[in-house]
Amino acid sequence: MSILLFGVSHRSAPVSVLEQLSLDRSDQIKIVDRVLQSPLVTEAMVLSTCNRVEVYAVVEAFHAGLSVIGQVLSEYSAMSIGDLTKYAYVRYSEAAVEHLFTVASGLDSAVVGEQQVLGQVRRAYAAAEANRTVGQVLHEVAQRALSVGKRVHSETAIDAAGVSVVSVALGIAGRTLGGLAGRIAVVIGAGAMGALSSSYLTQANVGRIHVLNRSLSRARRLAGKIGESGVPADVWTLNHLDEALADADLVVSCTGAVSPVVSLADVHHALAAMRRDETTRPLVICDLGMPRDVDPAVAKLPGVWVVDVEGVQREPSARASAADVDAARRIVAAEVATYLTRQRMAEVAPTVTALRQRAADVVEAELLRLDHRLPGLESAQREEVARTVRRVVDKLLHAPTVRIKQLASAPGGDSYTEALRELFELDQTAVDAVATAGELPVMVSGFSDTTRYGTSPAQSSSKYHAE
């Protein structure tokens, strides 16, 4: 069994495609449950953010597992398999591990180096663990990915500027407005992104923040925190959105709603009510939702500037320095190598244990024959013979078992494990019994190349769509 990743992200698809694949928490659970209905998939978890949807699964077979995941996502998104594969990428086994480590480190984010994705990976893993859809393999790789992400952020300056999708978007807004100090802001959505946006706005000394949210209790909690920072804040219902827009210089929307929250009519009414010069006082709307919170037609209105995720990606400030990125990538590469070495060594351990058990069985059988041939042998003599035989066997096996662990830890080392089983006629069933008994953990290793849908792992290129 190996890890299979099927994903679509901002690097492979436009926002319109990501919108079709956007998943809320209940959707993620349903998709994982559907995927796990296949007997060929034993573990699964979904990482869904505003920039990506990725399904990680432990599969018995590459093509069959890929077909299962692709079909489930196709049905959910109402996209044909053909359309979906235009934008999807696939990683298999070692490449899937490397990708998750890279994502957790912020190296694959729209804003390179941002830390929010580390929390998103943590929540995806925690949700899968709570629903008992991860086992030993995904548990190990997810835990390691979180550790790698922390190490990258602590040992490099990749996030020294504290950049995030929110900070970059509001930086663009600040330039457009000639500064944020004293401006009237509207924050739509009181979740994690809304709280992060509010924090940035208070640090920028905006004049007031109107908080709008479906749940008024959450909106009041967020407004209370904003007020504690010294910036006036109040709570509005979504029914009064057009009034809030009419009072605003800046809007940040990040609700996670399945359809636009800010309509063309809402903005039309707000512009009519404002009666202000569009050149001296434009309205800037930061649409950070996925799917989009703002009707795309709003961007065509005079005097309105819409900043979305695609605009954030194009912003120079969204890019970390080359030196920091290189340092982070070196850490990821080293961590991947360490993980895979441990994984391969763990994989050979059941075979080594089975070999030693086979040798012990042979020794015991021969000692039993000795008892039958020399029934008068004194117990002290028998014990000395037994110790001598066991010492000889241990010494004969020591060098080969140490060496096989070393050889098996290198790429392609599984061939040495197979050779050991062949040489000593070790039954695979016996080896599997050792692994499942819990005496030694079994990690999964496999192909090191990335994989293209519809080809074998050994023949594959990196993905459906070049990133």
Swiss-Prot record:
GO terms for molecular function: glutamyl-tRNA reductase activity; NADP binding. NADP(+) binds at G189, A190, G191, A192, M193, G194. Its EC number is 1.2.1.70. Transmembrane segments: none annotated. Keywords: NADP, Oxidoreductase, Porphyrin biosynthesis. Pathway: Porphyrin-containing compound metabolism; protoporphyrin-IX biosynthesis; 5-aminolevulinate from L-glutamyl-tRNA(Glu): step 1/2. One of its GO terms (biological process) is protoporphyrinogen IX biosynthetic process from glutamate. Residues 446-467 are annotated as: Disordered. It catalyses: (S)-4-amino-5-oxopentanoate + tRNA(Glu) + NADP(+) = L-glutamyl-tRNA(Glu) + NADPH + H(+). The record marks H99 as: Important for activity. Coiled coil: none annotated. Pfam families: GlutR_dimer, GlutR_N, Shikimate_DH. The active site is at C50 (nucleophile). Substrate binds at T49, C50, N51, R52, S109, E114, Q115, Q116, Q120. InterPro entries: 4pyrrol_synth_GluRdtase (IPR000343), 4pyrrol_synth_GluRdtase_dimer (IPR015896), 4pyrrol_synth_GluRdtase_N (IPR015895), GluRdtase_CS (IPR018214), GluRdtase_dimer_dom_sf (IPR036453), GluRdtase_N_sf (IPR036343), NAD(P)-bd_dom_sf (IPR036291), Shikm_DH/Glu-tRNA_Rdtase (IPR006151). It comes from the Bacteria. Residues 447-467 have a biased composition (Polar residues). Homodimer. Possesses an unusual extended V-shaped dimeric structure with each monomer consisting of three distinct domains arranged along a curved 'spinal' alpha-helix. The N-terminal catalytic domain specifically recognizes the glutamate moiety of the substrate. The second domain is the NADPH-binding domain, and the third C-terminal domain is responsible for dimerization. Catalyzes the NADPH-dependent reduction of glutamyl-tRNA(Glu) to glutamate 1-semialdehyde (GSA). Belongs to the glutamyl-tRNA reductase family. During catalysis, the active site Cys acts as a nucleophile attacking the alpha-carbonyl group of tRNA-bound glutamate with the formation of a thioester intermediate between enzyme and glutamate, and the concomitant release of tRNA(Glu). The thioester intermediate is finally reduced by direct hydride transfer from NADPH, to form the product GSA. This is Glutamyl-tRNA reductase. The gene is hemA.
